[in-house]
From Swiss-Prot:
Pathways involved: Alkaloid biosynthesis; ergot alkaloid biosynthesis
UniProt signal peptide: 1-20
Key words of the record: Alkaloid metabolism, NADP, Oxidoreductase, Signal
UniProt KW Signal keyword: yes
Main EC class the enzyme belongs to: oxidoreductase
A GO molecular function held by the record: oxidoreductase activity
Catalysed transformations (reactions): chanoclavine-I + NAD(+) = chanoclavine-I aldehyde + NADH + H(+)
Species name: Arthroderma otae (strain ATCC MYA-4605 / CBS 113480) (Microsporum canis)
Gene from which this protein is expressed: easD
Gene Ontology terms describing biological process: indole alkaloid biosynthetic process
EC numbers on record: 1.1.1.332
Pfam families for this protein: adh_short_C2
Name of protein: Chanoclavine-I dehydrogenase easD
Subunit: Homotetramer.
Length: 264
């Protein structure tokens, strides 16, 4: 079992989907505290209740957070340190989707500036801001509380694909994976491991946003199955994230692990 007991974790985008599944698994395995940053206050309230049912001993610290704001992210991480005194691991899951299959070839001509900026601000800038703040906190904490520390950034199967659509999404996720690999080399001497997880087609509330023309969840999943992709659960991805956050995954760093469907 992955060793995360009695440790403090930060999770962006933790209120639903893969982020929530990660929080639930960390609580089951004895995490001391889960510090969740997400835009949805309502989802965080529901998540906090479910975590308390799983493990009443796990402390839950929820913050309404816009990861595209460096100042908000910096304050969030500083608050974690001031409240709990340490940060052992972080999973940066927050991201936004981009709908596919709605544009005429060449789809590039319909990739507008505002959409590009919005996707990058969350999917790549947000990764930079969160990772940077977490490394700063871990570096400072490790001098007084040495031990294995880990950051997991969530990209996507799109980071490995070359799709003639959703340019902003795919490029931002490829950037996330590349960035994390570079950070991994930079911080490993400090005892901080950084890795990427790239989920395949995952059954989450965000999945229908990738296929906006579909009328039902079943239609969304059938679209992907026809293209040769299997559909996995958020819990499947969470198990890999928690393994990377745990000491059981030492000395793994600088990887981009595909979970679920790979490119056919």
């Amino acid at each position: 079992m992955a060793s995360v007991s009695s440790k403090i974790f930060a999770i962006t985008g933790g209120a639903s989907g893969i982020g929530a599944a990660t929080c639930h698994l960390l609580a089951r395995r004895g995490a001391a505290a889960l510090c969740i940053g997400d835009l949805s206050n309502e989802n965080m309230k529901q998540l906090e209740k479910s975590i308390r049912e799983i493990n009443p001993e796990t402390k839950v610290h929820c913050t309404v957070l816009d990861v595209s704001s460096s100042s908000e992210v910096d304050k969030w991480v500083k608050d974690i340190i001031s409240t709990f005194g340490d940060l052992h691991g972080a999973a940066n899951v927050a991201g936004i989707a981009q709908g596919a299959g709605m544009r005429q070839i060449p789809t590039l001509l319909e990739e507008d500036d505002e959409q590009w900026k919005k996707v990058f601000q969350v999917n790549l800038d947000g990764i930079l801001y969160a990772t940077r703040a977490q490394v700063r906190a871990m570096k400072d904490s490790s001098s007084t509380s040495p031990g294995d520390r880990s950051i997991v950034n969530v990209a996507s199967i799109a980071s490995m694909a070359h799709m003639p659509d959703v340019f902003a999404y795919g490029t931002s996720k490829a950037g996330c994976a590349y960035f994390t690999t570079c950070v991994a080399q930079d911080v490993i001497p400090l005892g901080i491991r950084a890795n990427t997880v790239s989920p395949g087609i995952t059954r989450t509330p965000m999945l229908p946003r990738f296929v906006p023309n579909a009328k039902t969840q079943e239609e969304v999943e059938e679209t992907y199955k026809k293209e040769g992709f299997s559909v996995i659960e958020a819990d499947d991805v969470a198990r890999t994230i928690v393994w990377l956050l745990s000491e059981d995954s030492r000395p793994v760093f600088g990887t981009n692990i595909n979970v679920g469907a790979c490119m056919p």
